[in-house]
Amino acid sequence: MISIYKSVDFNNPSKIERLENIEPGCWINVTAPTKQELTLIQKKTNVPMDFLNAAMDDEETSRLEIEDTNILIIVDIPFTEMEDNSLSYDTYPLAIVHTEKEIITICLKNSKVLTDFINGKVKTFFSFKRSRFILQILYKVATYYLLYLRQIDKKSVMVEKHLHKSLKNKELIQLLSLEKSLVYFSTSLKSNEI
């Protein structure tokens, strides 16, 4: 799905407007795109197709690439999902493409990180201040990692307390699931460090 946004009110920086067409200074947010959608974006922005396809592999590693006037930044971002009546934590790659005229974000799933910008929760956000926008995205990613790590820590402590009281498979499975989440986060954070 392709959504195009642009800051329109300089007195209210967090207010953005949804557009029908790509304009200079806009933000193109792409979620779980089809090949046709990526081809359309490529034709309208002249961004290399490998930049646009970069986030389509959920195992893609974090990196930075520069080609002509386009900059590709890939970072792993945290997600939560309901799995067997329990909240599980995972990471997926987010591609951020900085072009001469716009910012393009591409992710396999709808992200709370980007939804915060759409819903006006990020103050002093302007779609046309592309470098600043990238820094704000990275800050939001770090904020969500910290939030989820605190949640995982609290759940681990609770599960450990239950485990000390009763040695049941359910608690062991929950603890292993949390441990798996920590491994995902740790690997992604190490990868983002590069």
Regions found by a protein language model. Give the residues of each.
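Peripheral, non-transmembrane regulatory/ligand-interaction domains of membrane transport proteins
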Residues: 1-194
